Amino acid sequence: MAKLTKRMRAIREKIEAGKLYPANEAFALLKEISSVKFAESVDVSVNLGVDPRKSDQVVRGSTVLPNGTGKTVRVAVFTQGANAEAAKAAGADIVGMDDLAAEVKKGNMDFDVVIATPDAMRVVGQLGQILGPRGLMPNPKVGTVTTDVATAVKNAKGGQVRYRTDKAGIIHCSIGKVGFEPDALKENLNALLADLQKAKPSAAKGVYMKKVTVSTTMGPGIAVDQASLSA
């Protein structure tokens, strides 16, 4: 059996297996055990009581985190005319139509989020094989196909995160950086969980939010006591 590194031994001493930690204590622990030199993201995994094999139990959507993600987000918008001007005014990094599609086809994709107006989907639809595998394809269910491009751009820039259940019925999402104050991370987590609750499928039975776990990019998971989140 491989020997535990000094760092892993220290982490095991601080995190009690099987314990549910109050949210603020969990976030403080993440900061304490983080030893890498870059600003790690704080990630959350939420085990949902759904059957993701059934299409009516797939949970997907987006949340605007009140305290942002701590990341700089570059936004591309497929649109034209007055909407193009509105997108630029809202802070979009790249705005275009066929010219932007041509750049995407060349592999020039210096952006993290793609937004499109409905009339632009005839152009964006041709890029599905490029944007889809990268998780960049605009979708009305998460607010990235919209006539209100200004709000969509501001949301993307301001800390909007997207989520979708994986094959095991788990939502994975980043809710900030390890350097955030615990209260700020807690507010972000509460916003996400509130939207997940609203997105609960009517066909889901039993306990819906089964487990909430937080971790850093390179660290172990810490189970959160959900009762501490409303406090």
From Swiss-Prot:
- Key word tRNA-binding present: yes
Q: Which PROSITE patterns match?
A: RIBOSOMAL_L1
Tell me a Gene Ontology molecular-function term this record carries: rRNA binding
| UniProt key word Cell division | no
Protein keywords: Repressor, Ribonucleoprotein, Ribosomal protein, RNA-binding, rRNA-binding, Translation regulation, tRNA-binding
Give the signal peptide range: none
Origin: domain of life: Bacteria
The record's GO CC annotations read: cytosolic large ribosomal subunit
Q: Which GO terms describe its biological process?
A: regulation of translation; translation
Query: What family does this chain come from, according to its entry?
Result: Belongs to the universal ribosomal protein uL1 family.
Q: Which HAMAP family match?
A: Ribosomal_uL1_B
> Assembly and interactions?
Part of the 50S ribosomal subunit.
What does this protein's UniProt record list under function?
Answer: Binds directly to 23S rRNA. The L1 stalk is quite mobile in the ribosome, and is involved in E site tRNA release. Protein L1 is also a translational repressor protein, it controls the translation of the L11 operon by binding to its mRNA.
Indicate what this protein is called per its UniProt record: Large ribosomal subunit protein uL1
